[in-house]
Amino acid sequence: MRRGQDDSKKLLAELRAIYARVDSSLGGWTCDASTDCCRFGVTGREPYPTAIEIAELERAVRARGGLPKRRVLPVAGERRCALLGDDGKCLVYASRPFGCRTFYCERAKSPVGEGVRALPKNEINDASRAIVDLSAKFDARNPGPRPLSKVTATW
């Protein structure tokens, strides 16, 4: 069952704290901003946010006044993320889901000056488990995950 508004705010604050830890552990990692990972038909993959992550995305989309109307027709088969702006940047970058934060794209580059090194898998796995647990507290009947494209299709 979904919690009260105060509980939801606390759980969302916990989610943002997990995101901050993930971002810190990935400090220095970059990508070339090709937006390949934001075009699910190109990579054949897409993030599956949990219920609590979806609530955070909804909050961020509401805060910016909704999603913009697309000015151009989508490229067939591209399956572009609804959160990708026409400028190639995420419209809700600070609230992007865990999957978007953790460089699931092969284009990720390790921090400059450190040579090639692996992503911190233990920290990523721990954070993933914490988000799943948090989502179960947030919405025990339907904690997720769900395909991001299906979630945003109704926005």
Q: Which residue stretches match the model-derived regions?
A:
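Short loop/turn segments that flank or connect secondary-structure elements
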Residues: 1-155
